[in-house]
């Protein structure tokens, strides 16, 4: 059963109309309240290095890599949203990227303190993004790309919030207070604000009827065909790694409950006409695929290097 007790409640659908002014004010507050976490603010004390590495080493490896891929994410946004407004530019260039890169650097140093290898982020912009970017100067296409970006952001940030809360709970149970209080807690405090930005922005597009019915239809089709879990980058290696993250955090015990948490925003905005559907089926499909790939890896007794090297 999915344990929602430790999952912080995200903002529900706002009843009032979301204006661009409200979104801009939210971005400004994020920048003021949560400056990037300084490396020298971290207490590097680890009481039982071997135990932390055994229980959370793989998860920290994965999250460090994903956070360090923010520079590629920004490049993708420059391709997909060539006419992004000032609020979006401020968010991804002045708030999100500086915060996320520090998360990655801090986690990367932690994993090396645990005796593990440094992160190797995947920084190549995909061919699919480049193709879509070639059409992004057309406003109808850019509007679709923008909604896809907001939905992807909401999904990935929700996954991050759940993971960091699970890790924090685990570190506290291990008595690793330095890691909990000076690494995981500061990081997890910044992620919900990112989620709120994506949720507000996507909701505003639907409320304002920015997309015509044919654009929404195409968005649904593209979302169904292109959905990926955070950090998997459409690669089997990373999909199996993500399956390992879910297993280590105990999220594989109730994949439907996890899918419900991850897919709440797009289920409401894209699939409201499908009454009774709790989450888009493609999210559960992606979760199952990652877990199955991870279990296949375990069954073969292979390391990542042996399997994909």
How would you describe each model-predicted region?
Residues 2-309:
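Non-heme di-metal
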